[in-house]
Design a protein with these regions (language model features):
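Active-site diphosphate/adenylate-binding microenvironment
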Residues: 16-29, 34-37, 42-49, 335-405
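N-terminal alpha/beta PP-like core and its mobile active-site loop of ThDP/TPP-dependent enzymes
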Residues: 5-333, 361-364
Length: 408
């Protein structure tokens, strides 16, 4: 097999090489892989084409977790390479997390040759059906002549909006048949912008009596946007909060500190019970993680007025800039978190002592992978004043993400 693959490079470009070259040309330069027989031509192309770094994962869930962490931090997609339907299935848990985080990823999933599928070999599966619940874009590339264009479309889809998962299915004969082109990158559709009418309505709500909360996620949790939100808070007295689990949250010393809506339902209800106006920035109305007997699913009071400032697919940074201009807050100073760190504790190892150690020893620009759901909430106060860092949470609630998320 190896000698055959190596000798194939003496022949005209095949579909696999066409796809890899297209990915590189479109800015995808890392591929996290767990391949099998059907993907060997793609593996050979990864080795042959300059500009693509190949990272092997020994389990598909690790592969998809690494792609999630990479996309969250690099703000651009990587590629995965997975082995048919079962391989994709093994990676679904962390693709679920990645979808909730709005992480850009291009999944390349190998398949049997198109003419072999009808024989229902052991690994034959409905790959498109498996991919759809975690993908915003799914396509099977039926011909080596089409694979370059399909690859460019997949990258465009992954880069669209706040970030999406695009799954491109690569039949073995599409990979090994002769190809004739490398596709140019496709323009990504611009994100929609907040309207002037919405800006006016949000500004008015912020100036009214009663407690107002701006609740956010996504790109609103980056340092520059938080700085503007801090100025809005300084002028209007509003509260700022984020979802319980966010794809990437820049926090720590020197940054604007905001609340996180807590996981335990009773605590979350207490946090929100006094809110009169809720402004949603990339989020939906806060809801409970699970349903509980005699407790509400929606966490805000019935009397709370809800304003949709921008949904997650919109340009959140622009929305905040426009609101800051409308309120004329640029001469106001945001309240930034002072540097402080907890003292190290001795004695028995507890969640509190671990949190103290993390807050005390965390280096500057650390990346924290938080896959906790229960005990981990106690880490927030102990790390709030630590060195500036990025907090990557378990956005989809599917545990097992932590190590792969930061192994990038």
């Amino acid at each position: 097999m190896l000698s055959y693959l190596l000798s194939s490079w003496e022949n005209p470009m095949n579909g696999a090489e066409s796809l890899v070259k297209t990915l590189v040309k479109s800015g995808v330069d890392v591929c996290f892989t767990n391949p099998g027989t059907s993907e060997m031509h793609f593996v050979a192309a990864l080795d042959h084409v300059e500009g693509m770094r190949c990272v092997l994962g020994l389990f598909e869930g690790v592969v998809t977790g690494m792609a999630d962490g990479y996309g969250r931090m690099a703000d651009k997609p990587s590629s995965t390479l997975l082995h048919l339907g079962p391989g994709l299935g093994n990676g679904l848990a962390n693709l679920h997390n990645a979808k909730k985080a709005h992480t850009p990823i291009v999944n390349i999933v190998g398949d049997h040759a198109t003419y072999h599928v009808e024989y229902d070999a052991p690994l034959t599966a409905d790959i498109e059906g498996i991919a759809k619940p975690v993908s915003s874009w799914v396509k099977t590339s039926k011909s080596s002549k089409d694979i370059a264009r399909d690859g460019a479309e997949a990258v465009m889809a992954a880069r669209s909006g706040p970030g999406q998962i695009a799954t491109l299915i690569l039949p073995a004969n599409t990979a090994w048949d002769e190809a004739n082109s490398v596709a140019n990158p496709l323009d990504v559709p611009p994100q929609s912008k907040i309207s002037s009418e919405t800006i006016t309505a949000i500004a008015k709500a912020l100036c009214e009596d009663g407690e107002t909360l701006i609740h956010m996620t996504g790109r609103a949790l980056r340092e520059d946007t938080l700085n503007l939100l801090g100025k809005i808070q300084s002028k209007t007295g509003c509260r700022l909060s984020c979802m319980t689990s966010n794809g990437r949250w820049q926090r720590g010393a020197g940054r604007v500190a905001i609340e996180r809506i807590q996981y335990p339902i009773d605590i979350a209800l207490k946090q929100l019970e006094t809110v009169k106006n809720l402004i949603l920035l990339g989020t939906k109305v806060p809801v409970a993680f699970f349903a509980y007997p005699n407790k509400p699913s929606v966490l805000i009071p019935d009397s709370c007025r809800v304003f949709q400032m921008a949904d997650i697919d919109m340009d959140l940074g622009y929305a905040v800039e426009a609101l800051a201009d409308e309120l004329d807050v640029h001469n106001h100073q945001p309240k930034k978190q002072e540097y402080s760190k907890p003292e190290l504790m001795s004695g028995k190892l507890t969640s509190e002592s671990i949190a103290c150690a993390l807050g005390n020893l965390m280096p500057e620009n650390a990346i924290i992978a938080d896959e906790s759901v229960s005990s981990g909430r106690g880490f927030m106060p102990f790390t709030q004043g630590a060195n500036p860092h990025d907090w990557l949470a378990l956005t989809g609630g599917s545990i097992g993400l932590g190590l792969s998320l930061i192994h990038i």
